[in-house]
Amino acid sequence: MGRRKKMVERVTALMSNPVMIRNIAIIAHIDHGKTTLSDNLLAGAGMISKDLAGRQLFMDSDEEEQERGITIDSANVSMVHEFEDEEYLINLIDTPGHVDFGGDVTRAMRAVDGAVVVIDAVEGTMPQTETVLRQALKEHVRPVLFINKVDRLINELQVDAQEMQIRLGKLIDHVNKLIKGMNEERYNQGWRVDAAEGTVAFGSALYNWAISVPMMQKTGVSFGEVFDYCRAEDMKSLGEKCPLHEAVNDMVIRFLPSPIDAQEDRVGVIWHGDLEAGIGKQMAVADATGDLAFMVTDISMDPHAGEVSTGRLFSGSLSRGMEVYVSGAAKPNRIQQVGVFMGPERLEVDKIPAGNIAAVTGLRDAIVGSTVTTLDGMSPFESIRHASEPVVTVAVEAKHMKDLPKLVEVLRQVAKEDPTLKITLDEETGEHLMAGMGELHLEVIAHRIERDKGVEISTTPPIVVYRETITGTAGPVEGKSPNRHNRFYVVVEPLEPEVRELIREGEISMRMPELERREKLIAAGLDKDEAKRIADIFESNAYFDMTKGIQHLNETMELVLEGFVEVMKAGPLSKEPCMGVKVKLMDAKLHEDAVHRGPAQVIPASRQAIQAAMLMADDTLFEPYQKVFIQTPQEQMGGATKEIQGRRGIIIDMTSEGDTTIIESKAPVSELFGFAGDIRSATEGRAMWSTEFVGFEPLPTNMITEVVSGIRERKGLKKDLPQAQDFMSM
């Protein structure tokens, strides 16, 4: 314990000097070696035994992670590294690589300033590598590259020294091509990765060695010698001469920014307040004496302390007993404990200053994405946008009736811990529905509810979440209130694709300054008048108030928009969420007495006008698609392609490398249930595969009636497809 205590003392001493801090994440495709790399960095810092590093998987502290051999949650740790006779504090987050847990990566990107991108030298860049790199660049997080498993290239693929350099060069070029394509401005500012400069390291996380150009200069070990050591399988000597933690941490400290350098650039990307005054200025310089600005990026449950909110502290300092405001909460919260993480352990400290990643208890109203501040009325941070959407749903029931109240509380907790999970109560059937990123995601959550929360549950087989949208235009359609005194006239049409995409990416929101929003909408192809009159955005749908001078509309607008949101959450065709719908209010007639235009009158009138108009505008269903990447020996290629084509899938591209074929394809999520077992059988267990969410595509016309009827029946609605008249009968 003495060693750990000493480490805590060193960590706390360095916390208050942001120049000496690096907040970083390790990101990669699944099984490319992130957690093994993290272990060796910790061993180098003296936090775990060197003999166990790479096998202990210290960061995978969850029982399920160890069983499945994958990282499911992001794990945080603070450690100290000495570079050029100075001590630095590295706050490290190890993230999951499986596509179903990509939400953890997105949230981690908000907390860090730099990322070590890990790529398997044999497999090269894979779909999830591209996804995590895109998320990093979107949040203005600077990447450096670690090419792992170089020993496999030499010993398994038997490449010679020259071919190895060519292959590694190609891999680096490909990463740079991705960086340039995703953020050219940053690429031109020197964010490209370059072996000669030192922003690329090569090595083996399993055998604990790594080399980079600065490391070669420091140790005198040449690339040729590395090759010879690997051929002789003398990894031990290589690990002693070129320890992995030294090469990687030196690269992190030399090239990734400190909070002072990073925040000046990043604050404008993640916060839309005034950067020239008050808290904006304080965040830009990570001012520990300024007002508190803390963003929650993760929530976990501690059996003793309750909810632990982890996040990035941009300005001010956190200490016990502070009273703080949480965005969206009515009353202030009081901070109970502040601490830092050492893998699975949370260690209490007295105070944490700006520029650090902190773990706090007492924020009962916080959710992931909350802004926590001492400044009442501070404009909140931009919400965290996830690359994927929940597309698979299961119904959850408690096995024993006595557990029902506990299940309701447990579901509230898991939704708070994992914001990519959507929990809803189906009013018709009384079932709790749990929507997640994929089969594995929901399996893990269900297992945790039973294991950690102690509630036995049963779940239905997974079903797909569709999207309702319109392909035509309709209106003006009249919606009447039950008392006949209020009428709304709406037009619906498809929302411009570019506008929809910008909303989905978080580039356009109702939170941003009006002028900036208007300019972006016009640039995306919206009519000037419409851009000026946008009244609400919900998911990827928008509402426009095109009326002029209607009395009492201002005070009624909130209720009108409530009707809009209700329909966008559950469309008229099958009560599935809507996407890409533009609703325009063209005219309204309102009763002059407020008593006659209350919620019970206005909401149904607003809602029914939109529902009827959507059914007139060719309301249809879109289904979620995933890209499927398969690596298989050539002789198994036929089995793999047949497996995709038999699931309404399309082969997009096929490339060969040696005797391996890489198939890029896409298929509907509804057809991919059970794919893992089937592809294993079809290729005799020799295929490696991964998926990536690519969005929604139209459901084939010949399937619409059957699918809609099935959804309606499942939800306890009339099986027959609804007609516009059903909503206009009032």
From Swiss-Prot:
SMART domains for this protein: EFG_C, EFG_IV
Species this protein is from: Methanococcoides methylutens
Modified residues (Diphthamide): 596
Protein name, as recorded: Elongation factor 2
Gene Ontology MF annotations: GTP binding; GTPase activity; translation elongation factor activity
Binding, GTP: 28-35, 94-98, 148-151
Pfam families (UniProt xref): EFG_C (PF00679), EFG_III (PF14492), EFG_IV (PF03764), GTP_EFTU (PF00009), GTP_EFTU_D2 (PF03144)
UniProt function note: Catalyzes the GTP-dependent ribosomal translocation step during translation elongation. During this step, the ribosome changes from the pre-translocational (PRE) to the post-translocational (POST) state as the newly formed A-site-bound peptidyl-tRNA and P-site-bound deacylated tRNA move to the P and E sites, respectively. Catalyzes the coordinated movement of the two tRNA molecules, the mRNA and conformational changes in the ribosome.
